[in-house]
C-alpha cells in the first residue's frame, strides 16, 4: 500500500495569478438592523486563485499517505455508528499512541443515530449513559431515570467531531469491509482475527469482474456493524461461515476476564454460531448488550447491535444509552487484549517495521 514515489514528495505549487491581497474582511457579527446588516463587502469579494490540479494533489497526497500509515494499524473499528464512534472516542482519549482506523461503508458516517425512533428528532438515553454525555460536554434535559438530547444529530455530530480531532484516528468512509484476515496460531492450531479486507463500498460485485480488494493488518478488530442494511452484522455472519460447527447458542460465550496475570481465551472460531436477534424489550436489551460486549473470538471484539445477532438478545430501539456504553466497554475489552494479540501476531510473521 506504499504510495507512488511521486506522491511521497511534496511538490511546491507555484501557480499564481498575481492576486490582490486575500486578507478580506469577513465579520460574522453585526449589530446593524433594517437593511444595513453587512458581514463583508460582497462587491469586492473574491476567493484566492487556485489551479484545479492543486485541489487534486491536496486530496490525493493526504489520502495516499493515510493509506500507507494505517495499512498497519493497532486497532480497526468496523462501523462508524454510535457504538463504534463511542469506542473510538474512549480509545482516543486513553491511548493517543495507538493507530486506529475506522472503516465505514456509508458516505455519511453516523449509522442510525441521526434521528430518534420513527424519524423523530429527540434522542433518549437511560441513565447512567448521561455520564458519557457529560464527558463530551453535551447538553440534555434531565427527566429523572433518563435524559433527552434535543436532536440525535447533535449527539452524533458532537461525537464525530471529537473523534476526528484525534490525530491518531482515521475515518475511511465509503469503504466496506469484505472479509477478515485470519491467522492460525502454531501453538494452539486455532484461528484468530488479525485484520480486515477492504474495498470501495460503491463497487458492484455482480457486474464487474476484477474486484481484488486491499487489506489492513491490526492486532484487534472491533466490529460495530449494527443489524440493519446490506452490511448489517457483517462480521458476525462471516464468522459463522468461517466456523460452521454446531453450538448451543443459549450457553453463551466464554467471556475474557483478567482474574490472574493470564487472560482467559474466548471460544475458537470453529465454535461460533449466530444466535439471531430477538424482539424488542428495552429493559432486557440494553443491559444484555453492554454486559455482553467482549472479545467474541481471539482478535475480534463485537459491540453494539451486532452483538444481538451474536448472542440472540433482544433489540432495544429507540433508546441509545447501550450504544454509547457498549462502545466504552468495547474500548476496555480491546485494551485488555491488545498486547497479547500483538505478541501473537509478531510471533507469527514478525514485528511490523515501517
From Swiss-Prot:
* SUPFAM superfamilies documented for this protein: FAD/NAD(P)-binding domain
Q: Highest lineage ranks of the organism?
A: Eukaryota, Fungi, Dikarya, Ascomycota, Saccharomycotina
Task: Provide the disulphide bond pattern.
Answer: none
Xref: HAMAP family? THI4 (MF_03158)
Q: Indicate which residues the UniProt annotation says bind substrate.
A: 83, 104-105, 112, 177, 212, 227, 305, 315-317
Q: Which organism is it from?
A: Candida albicans (strain WO-1)
Q: What does this protein do?
A: Involved in biosynthesis of the thiamine precursor thiazole. Catalyzes the conversion of NAD and glycine to adenosine diphosphate 5-(2-hydroxyethyl)-4-methylthiazole-2-carboxylic acid (ADT), an adenylated thiazole intermediate. The reaction includes an iron-dependent sulfide transfer from a conserved cysteine residue of the protein to a thiazole intermediate. The enzyme can only undergo a single turnover, which suggests it is a suicide enzyme. May have additional roles in adaptation to various stress conditions and in DNA damage tolerance.
* A GO term, aspect molecular function: cysteine-dependent adenosine diphosphate thiazole synthase activity
Fill in the subunit field for this protein: Homooctamer.
Which cofactors, by name? Fe cation
Top enzyme class, one word, equals transferase
The entry's protein name is: Thiamine thiazole synthase
Keywords, sorted A to Z? Cytoplasm, Iron, Metal-binding, NAD, Nucleus, Thiamine biosynthesis, Transferase
Question: Which NCBIfam families does the record match to this protein?
Answer: sulfide-dependent adenosine diphosphate thiazole synthase
Which superkingdom? Eukaryota
Q: Which family does it belong to?
A: Belongs to the THI4 family.
What catalytic activity is recorded? [ADP-thiazole synthase]-L-cysteine + glycine + NAD(+) = [ADP-thiazole synthase]-dehydroalanine + ADP-5-ethyl-4-methylthiazole-2-carboxylate + nicotinamide + 3 H2O + 2 H(+)
Q: Which gene encodes it?
A: THI4
Record PTM 2,3-didehydroalanine (Cys), positions in chain: 210
| Any Gene Ontology CC annotation | nucleus
For this chain, the Swiss-Prot or TrEMBL PTM comment says:
During the catalytic reaction, a sulfide is transferred from Cys-210 to a reaction intermediate, generating a dehydroalanine residue.
Amino acid at each position: 500500500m506504499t504510495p507512488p514515489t511521486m506522491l511521497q514528495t511534496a511538490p511546491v505549487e507555484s501557480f499564481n495569478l498575481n492576486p490582490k491581497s486575500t486578507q478580506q474582511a469577513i465579520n460574522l457579527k453585526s449589530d446593524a438592523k433594517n437593511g444595513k446588516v453587512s458581514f463583508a463587502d460582497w462587491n469586492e469579494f473574491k476567493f484566492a486563485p487556485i489551479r484545479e490540479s492543486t485541489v487534486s494533489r491536496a486530496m490525493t497526497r493526504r489520502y495516499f499517505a493515510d493509506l500507507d500509515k494505517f495499512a498497519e494499524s493497532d486497532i480497526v473499528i468496523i462501523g462508524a455508528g454510535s457504538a463504534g464512534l463511542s469506542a473510538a472516542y474512549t480509545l482516543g482519549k486513553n491511548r493517543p499512541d495507538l493507530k486506529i482506523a475506522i472503516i465505514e461503508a456509508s458516505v455519511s458516517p453516523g449509522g442510525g443515530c441521526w434521528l430518534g425512533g420513527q424519524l423523530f428528532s429527540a434522542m433518549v438515553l437511560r441513565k447512567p449513559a448521561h455520564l458519557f454525555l457529560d464527558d463530551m460536554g453535551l447538553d440534555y434535559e434531565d427527566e429523572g431515570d433518563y435524559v433527552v438530547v434535543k436532536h440525535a444529530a447533535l449527539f452524533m455530530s458532537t461525537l464525530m467531531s471529537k473523534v476526528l480531532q484525534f490525530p491518531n484516528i482515521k475515518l475511511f468512509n465509503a469503504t466496506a469491509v469484505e472479509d477478515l484476515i485470519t491467522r492460525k496460531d502454531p501453538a494452539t492450531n486455532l484461528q484468530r482475527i488479525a485484520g480486515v479486507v477492504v474495498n470501495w463500498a460503491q463497487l458492484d460485485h455482480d457486474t464487474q469482474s476484477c474486484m481484488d480488494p486491499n487489506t489492513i493488518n491490526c492486532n484487534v478488530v472491533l466490529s460495530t456493524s449494527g443489524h440493519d442494511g446490506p452490511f448489517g452484522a457483517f462480521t458476525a455472519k462471516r464468522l459463522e461461515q468461517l466456523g460452521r460447527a454446531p453450538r448451543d447458542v443459549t450457553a453463551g460465550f466464554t467471556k475474557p476476564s483478567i482474574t490472574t496475570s493470564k487472560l482467559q481465551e474466548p471460544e475458537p472460531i470453529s465454535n461460533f454460531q449466530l444466535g439471531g436477534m430477538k424482539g424488542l424489550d428495552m429493559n432486557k436489551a440494553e443491559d444484555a448488550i453492554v454486559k455482553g460486549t467482549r472479545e467474541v473470538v481471539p482478535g475480534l471484539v463485537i459491540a453494539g447491535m451486532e452483538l444481538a445477532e451474536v448472542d440472540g438478545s433482544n433489540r432495544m430501539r429507540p433508546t441509545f444509552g447501550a450504544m454509547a456504553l457498549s462502545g466504552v466497554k468495547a474500548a476496555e475489552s480491546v485494551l485488555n487484549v491488545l498486547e497479547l494479540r500483538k505478541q501473537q501476531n509478531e510471533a507469527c510473521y514478525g514485528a511490523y517495521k515501517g
